[in-house]
C-alpha cells in the first residue's frame, strides 16, 4: 500500500472551509465535528477516515518561540586557546511587542509574557543583540535567522541567554539543520541564499522567520490502496476531504489547455496519451522557498526550478511529468520498446540493461528515458539548461509496473502510473506546469509541441435501488444514491425504460479518473462510503443451511480383510460445523509446544504454485506420471503400501539417482479444483488464491534459509480456496484463467460454490537435533513429518493412519495419504526434490497437509477416558524375516490380528536389509496385557505364535530366534 505525504497548507488551498459547523445538508447525515478556517491535522485525518482513507500525522512544527529575522551589523573575530575562531556579532532584531506596544526586556521570560513576533507594526522597537557565532559564511549586512531566548528548536533544544567563550550570547544565529529546512550544519542560513530580487528586498528585521520560511506547516501521511490511483495527489485527497465535509472543492488545474503542434513524434507503441511542449529562455536558478518547503514536506528533495516544478505538479495533480534538455535531443522523439541489449544511464547514476518489453522515449541516438519510471542522464535538465521539452504522457499501468519491478526502480512516477492515472488530465497538467515555469523561471512558452490522446469513455452501468439494497443490506432512496454518485464525479441519469414501480433504475457513467468503477458492487461501495457506514443497521448474523459440496474417499474393510486391496468409494460426510476457532487455537498451541514455529503467509500465489501443491482429497493417483521409484523405499511405521490388483509392488533399478526418480509431472491439475484468479490482485505476478499452504511455507523456508536460519520446523493454519467445476462468480474472483463478469443475481449462490476449508500444514528441513559434544546431530527425515501428523491427530483428539500413495508435489515412494475414520483427509511425505530446488531449498524437505474441516465433519475432539490398567504387562520382541516389498504397516496389521486382544501395543524398533538377497528383517516391540488378570508365559507365547503363524501364511515370514 502506497503512502502519500500531504502538507496541510497545500491541501487547504483547494477546499473552502467555513467557521463553525460544516454544512449538514446534502449527502452526509451524521453529525460532523467543528472545523475552523484552518483545521488541524487531526481534523483532516478524521475526515479522511470517514471516507475510507487511513493516515497518521508525520511532521509537526517543532519550532516555537521568538524566531525572527536579524541583520548582522558588525562582528569581531576572536581566536581562542583551543584553536577555534568565533565571531562576536552585533545583530539587529525586532524586540517582541507586548499588547501595550512596549518592547519586552532582553531578560524577559517568554513563558510568562505574551508577545507578537511579526513586523506588522512600524512602531516596533528595533534593538541590537550580542550573539556568539561559530560560523564564518556571512558578512556584514546579511539577513539571518535569529533564535531569541525562549525559543525551541527541533530535538528539544531550548535557547537561553548564556555565557559562551567569555561573552554573554543573547540568542543564536541558526543554520539550516537547526531549523529543520536542510542538512547543512557547516554554516548559518543566509536569507540571500533562499530569497532573491523583490522577495529579498521586502524582508525586514524582526519579521517572523517561521512564517517566512513556511516552518509552521505540518504534514499527514495517507495510505492509498492500489485501486485508488486518483488519490495519489493533493488534488485527489482534497476532493475526498471536501466530499467528507460537504464543502466546495477548487480544482487547481486550468480549464484551458495550451495550443501546441508542429513537433513530430514517432509513436510506434501507442501510449494512452502523449503531450509535449517546448519552453525556452529559462532561468533555472533558484526555487522559491514556499515550493521547496512543500516538496520537502511531501518527501521530495529540491533540485532546480524546472525539476521542482515538474515534481510539484506531479504531487499536486497525480500526473507525472518529465522535462528534457531540448538541446540534448538528437533528431525527433520516438516512443518505442527497447532494442535488444540497449542500455540507459539514469539520472541517479545507474546503468540499466533494458528489456525488449520496456517502453522508452528515445531519439536518434538511443533511449532518453524509461517511460513512466525514470529519466536518462543524457537529456537531464541542469542549471545551464535554457530550452526544455516538457512531456506529459499516460502509459499502460501493467507495462509500467512490470518495468519498475524488472529493474527494481520504484519511483514516484511509477507508483502513480502503476495505479492508473487519469488520461484526461495529462494536457491540463502540462499547461499547469508551463504556467509555473513561466512565472517562476521566466520561461517563454512556445506553440511548438505535440498532442496525442486515445481515450474511450467507460461504458455506462445500469444500477437499481434493489442492487444497492442487495449488496449493502439496507435501503436508500434514488435521490440519495444519485447525489452520492454525483459527488464522486459520476454522470447519473434516470433510466425509465428499465425502471419498474418497485425498482428505480439509473444509468451511471464513471468519471475518467475512476477506472476502478466497473460494476454494481463498485458503485454500491461508493454509495455507502459517501453516505456513511453508520447508516448500515446492526443485524444478527443469519447463515443459510446448505450441504457442503465436499467429496472424500472411504476405505472399506470386510471381516478384518481388505476388499480388493483398498476400495475407494466417494462419500459425503455428515453436515457438521467446520473446525472452530477454539479447536484451531488449541491445535496451534499443541504444535508450538512440540517445537514447531507458527507462520502466517499470504493467500495469494502464482498459477504454477496453485497447480503444483494442491492437496486434493479427490486426487486420482492414476492421473499423475508414475516413474520408477526404485526398490523398497523407507516407509515409517503405520504406512501401508497399496498396489493395484495383480501387481507385485514397486519395482525399478536401485542405482537410479534420487532426482532422476523424482521427475514426476508437477503440472497435473485436477479438473474439479481450478485455481481461482483475482480481478484486481495486489501483485500481478500472484493473482490466484492458494489451494494449498505448502507453497507459502516453501517461500517462507527460502526466506529463512537465505538469512542463515537453516533448521526449520514451521506450520500454518489457514484457509485454502478450492473452486468447483462451474465458473465461480464470486465477487472479485473467477475460477478460470480468464476474467468473467460478476453476476448480480446469484452472487450468494456463486460464493457458496467455492469450498474454503481450514487446513494445517507442517514443513521441516535441516537438523532435527544439533550436533553437540557427546551427541550426534540428526537431520529431519520422513519419520519426523509422520510424527508431526500424529501430533496434529493428538491435538484434534483423533487417530490417523497412513496409506502409501503418489502426488505430483511429493517424492514418489515417500508419500502417503492421511486417513481418519476411513476417510482421506490429506497427504504427508517428502517434497519433490526438484520442487524444493526451485525454491533454493535442499533435497530433504518434508511436509504434511491435513484438511481440518473434513476432520471436524468426521467428529474430532471426542476424548475417550480409559480405565487405568490394574494388571501388569508383558513385553516381548518379535523379529520376522520377509520380502523387501512388504510394508511394515501391513505386517503390523496382520500381527495384531493374529495375536488377538491380548496385544495392547506394537511398534517397529529395527529394520535390517540383507545385502545379498531380497529379504529384510523387521523387529517389533510387543506389549501384552489382560485387563482382568495377570498374564502367564504360556498365554503370551501362544498369542505370539498365532501372530507368527498368520504372518507366515500371509507374507511367508520366518521368525528369527
Swiss-Prot record:
Keyword terms: Aminoacyl-tRNA synthetase, ATP-binding, Cytoplasm, Ligase, Magnesium, Metal-binding, Nucleotide-binding, Protein biosynthesis, RNA-binding, tRNA-binding
InterPro entries, alphabetized: aa-tRNA-synth_II/BPL/LPL (IPR045864), B3/B4_tRNA-bd (IPR005146), DNA-bd_dom_put_sf (IPR009061), Fdx_antiC-bd (IPR005121), Fdx_antiC-bd_sf (IPR036690), NA-bd_OB-fold (IPR012340), Phe-tRNA-ligase_IIc_bsu (IPR045060), Phe-tRNA-ligase_IIc_bsu_bact (IPR004532)
Catalytic activity as recorded in UniProt: tRNA(Phe) + L-phenylalanine + ATP = L-phenylalanyl-tRNA(Phe) + AMP + diphosphate + H(+)
Positions of disulphide bridges: none
Cofactor details (free text): Binds 2 magnesium ions per tetramer.
Signal sequence region: none
Location of the B5 domain: 456-538
One GO BP: phenylalanyl-tRNA aminoacylation
Compartment(s) where it occurs, according to its Swiss-Prot or TrEMBL record: Cytoplasm
Enzyme Commission number: 6.1.1.20
Residues noted as binding Mg(2+) in the record, renumbered to the chain: 516, 522, 525-526
Cofactor(s) the record lists: Mg(2+)
EC class name: ligase
Residue ranges of every copy of the FDX-ACB domain listed in the record: 869-960
PROSITE patterns in alphabetical order: B5, FDX_ACB, TRBD
Entry's family note: Belongs to the phenylalanyl-tRNA synthetase beta subunit family. Type 1 subfamily.
Protein name: Phenylalanine--tRNA ligase beta subunit
Amino acid at each position: 500500500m502506497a503512502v502519500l505525504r500531504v502538507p496541510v497548507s497545500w491541501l487547504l488551498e483547494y477546499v473552502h472551509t467555513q467557521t463553525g459547523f460544516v454544512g449538514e445538508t446534502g449527502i452526509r447525515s451524521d453529525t460532523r465535528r467543528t472545523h475552523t478556517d484552518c483545521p488541524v491535522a487531526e481534523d483532516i485525518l478524521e475526515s479522511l477516515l470517514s471516507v475510507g482513507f487511513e493516515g497518521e500525522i508525520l511532521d509537526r512544527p517543532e519550532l516555537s518561540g521568538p524566531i525572527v529575522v536579524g541583520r548582522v551589523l558588525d562582528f569581531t573575530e576572536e581566536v581562542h586557546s583551543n584553536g577555534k575562531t568565533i565571531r562576536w556579532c552585533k545583530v539587529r532584531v525586532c524586540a517582541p511587542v507586548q499588547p501595550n506596544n512596549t518592547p519586552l526586556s532582553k531578560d524577559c521570560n517568554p513563558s510568562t509574557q505574551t508577545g507578537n513576533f511579526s513586523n506588522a507594526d512600524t512602531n516596533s522597537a528595533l534593538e541590537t543583540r550580542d550573539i556568539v557565532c561559530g560560523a564564518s559564511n556571512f558578512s556584514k549586512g546579511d539577513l539571518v535567522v535569529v533564535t531569541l531566548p525562549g525559543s525551541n528548536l527541533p530535538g528539544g533544544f531550548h535557547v537561553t541567554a548564556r555565557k559562551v567563550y567569555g561573552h554573554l550570547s543573547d540568542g543564536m544565529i541558526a543554520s539550516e539543520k537547526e531549523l529543520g529546512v536542510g542538512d547543512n550544519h557547516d554554516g548559518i542560513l543566509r536569507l540571500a541564499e533562499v530569497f532573491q530580487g523583490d522577495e529579498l528586498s521586502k524582508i525586514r528585521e524582526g519579521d517572523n522567520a517561521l512564517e517566512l520560511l513556511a516552518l509552521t506547516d505540518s504534514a499527514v501521511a495517507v495510505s492509498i490502496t492500489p485501486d485508488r490511483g486518483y488519490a495519489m495527489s493533493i488534488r485527489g485527497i482534497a476532493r475526498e476531504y471536501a466530499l467528507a465535509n460537504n464543502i466546495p472543492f477548487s480544482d487547481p488545474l486550468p480549464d484551458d489547455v495550451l495550443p501546441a503542434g508542429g513537433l513530430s513524434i514517432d509513436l510506434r507503441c501507442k501510449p494512452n496519451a502523449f503531450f509535449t511542449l517546448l519552453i525556452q529562455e529559462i532561468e533555472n536558478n533558484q526555487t522559491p522557498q514556499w515550493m521547496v518547503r512543500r516538496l520537502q514536506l511531501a518527501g521530495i528533495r529540491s533540485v532546480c526550478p524546472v525539476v521542482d516544478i515538474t515534481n510539484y505538479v506531479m504531487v499536486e495533480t497525480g500526473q507525472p511529468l518529465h522535462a528534457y534538455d531540448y538541446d540534448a535531443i538528437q533528431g525527433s522523439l520516438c516512443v518505442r520498446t527497447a532494442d535488444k541489449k540497449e542500455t540507459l544511464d539514469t539520472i541517479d547514476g545507474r546503468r540499466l540493461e533494458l528489456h525488449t518489453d520496456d517502453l522508452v522515449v528515445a531519439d536518434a541516438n538511443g533511449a532518453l528515458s524509461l517511460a513512466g519510471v525514470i529519466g536518462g542522464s543524457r537529456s537531464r535538465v541542469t542549471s545551464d539548461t535554457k530550452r526544455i521539452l516538457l512531456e506529459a504522457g499516460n502509459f499502460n499501468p501493467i507495462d509500467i509496473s512490470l518495468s519498475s519491478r524488472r529493474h527494481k526502480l520504484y519511483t514516484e512516477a511509477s507508483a502513480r502510473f502503476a495505479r492508473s492515472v487519469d488520461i484526461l488530465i495529462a494536457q491540463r497538467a502540462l499547461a499547469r506546469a508551463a504556467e509555473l515555469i513561466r512565472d517562476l523561471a521566466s520561461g517563454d512558452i512556445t506553440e511548438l509541441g505535440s498532442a496525442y490522446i486515445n481515450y474511450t469513455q467507460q461504458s455506462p452501468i445500469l444500477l437499481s435501488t434493489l442492487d444497492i439494497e442487495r449488496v449493502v443490506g439496507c435501503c436508500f432512496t434514488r435521490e440519495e444514491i444519485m447525489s452520492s454518485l454525483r459527488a464522486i464525479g459520476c454522470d447519473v441519469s434516470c433510466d425509465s425504460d428499465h425502471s419498474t414501480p418497485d425498482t428505480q433504475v439509473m444509468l451511471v457513467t464513471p468519471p475518467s479518473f475512476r477506472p476502478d468503477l466497473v460494476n454494481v458492487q463498485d458503485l454500491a461501495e461508493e454509495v455507502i462510503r459517501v453516505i456513511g457506514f453508520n447508516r448500515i443497521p446492526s443485524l444478527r448474523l443469519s447463515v443459510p443451511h446448505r450441504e457442503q459440496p465436499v467429496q472424500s474417499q472411504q476405505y472399506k474393510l470386510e471381516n478384518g480383510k481388505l476388499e480388493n486391496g483398498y476400495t475407494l468409494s466417494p462419500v459425503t460426510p455428515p453436515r457438521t460445523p467446520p473446525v472452530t476457532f477454539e479447536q484451531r487455537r488449541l491445535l496451534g498451541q499443541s504444535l508450538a509446544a512440540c517445537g514447531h514455529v507458527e507462520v502466517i503467509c499470504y493467500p495469494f500465489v502464482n498459477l504454477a504454485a496453485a497447480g503444483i501443491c494442491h492437496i486434493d482429497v479427490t486426487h486420482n493417483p492414476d492421473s499423475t506420471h508414475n516413474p520408477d521409484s526404485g526398490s523398497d523405499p523407507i516407509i515409517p511405521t503405520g504406512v501401508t503400501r497399496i498396489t493395484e490388483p495383480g501387481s507385485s509392488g514397486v519395482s525399478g533399478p536401485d542405482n537410479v539417482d534420487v532426482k532422476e526418480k523424482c521427475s514426476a509431472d508437477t503440472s497435473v491439475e485436477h479438473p474439479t479444483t481450478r485455481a481461482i484468479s483475482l480481478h484486481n490482485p495486489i501483485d500481478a505476478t500472484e493473482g490466484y488464491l492458494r489451494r494449498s499452504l505448502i507453497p507459502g511455507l516453501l517461500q517462507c523456508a527460502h526466506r529463512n534459509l537465505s538469512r542463515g536460519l537453516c533448521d526449520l520446523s514451521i506450520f500454518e493454519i489457514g484457509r485454502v480456496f478450492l473452486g468447483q467445476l462451474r465458473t465461480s462468480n464470486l465477487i472479485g474472483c473467477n475460477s478460470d484463467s480468464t476474467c468473467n463478469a460478476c453476476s448480480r443475481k446469484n452472487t450468494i449462490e456463486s460464493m457458496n460454490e467455492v469450498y474454503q476449508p481450514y487446513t494445517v500444514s507442517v514443513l521441516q528441513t535441516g537438523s532435527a537435533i544439533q550436533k553437540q559434544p557427546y551427541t550426534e546431530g540428526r537431520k529431519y527425515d520422513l519419520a519426523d513429518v509422520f510424527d508431526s501428523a500424529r501430533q496434529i491427530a493428538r491435538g484434534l483428539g483423533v487417530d490417523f493412519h497412513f496409506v502409501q500413495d503418489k502426488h505430483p508435489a511429493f517424492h514418489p515412494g515417500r508419500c502417503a495419504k492421511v486417513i481418519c475414520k476411513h476417510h482421506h483427509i490429506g497427504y504427508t511425505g517428502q517434497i519433490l526434490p526438484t520442487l524444493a530446488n526451485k525454491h533454493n531449498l535442499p533435497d530433504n524437505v518434508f511436509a504434511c497437509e491435513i484438511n481440518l474441516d473434513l476432520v471436524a465433519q468426521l467428529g474430532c475432539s471426542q476424548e475417550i477416558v480409559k480405565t487405568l490398567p490394574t494388571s501388569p504387562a508383558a513385553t516381548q520382541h518379535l523379529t520376522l524375516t520377509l520380502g523387501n516389498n512388504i510394508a511394515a504397516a501391513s505386517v503390523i496389521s496382520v500381527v495384531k490380528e493374529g495375536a488377538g486382544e491380548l496385544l495392547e501395543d506394537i511398534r517397529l524398533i529395527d529394520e535390517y536389509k540383507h545385502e545379498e538377497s531380497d529379504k529384510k528383517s523387521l523387529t517389533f516391540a510387543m506389549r501384552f496385557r489382560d485387563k482382568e488378570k495377570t498374564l502367564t508365559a504360556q498365554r503370551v507365547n501362544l498369542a505370539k505364535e498365532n501372530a507368527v503363524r498368520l504372518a507366515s501364511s500371509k507374507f511367508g515370514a520366518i521368525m528369527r530366534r
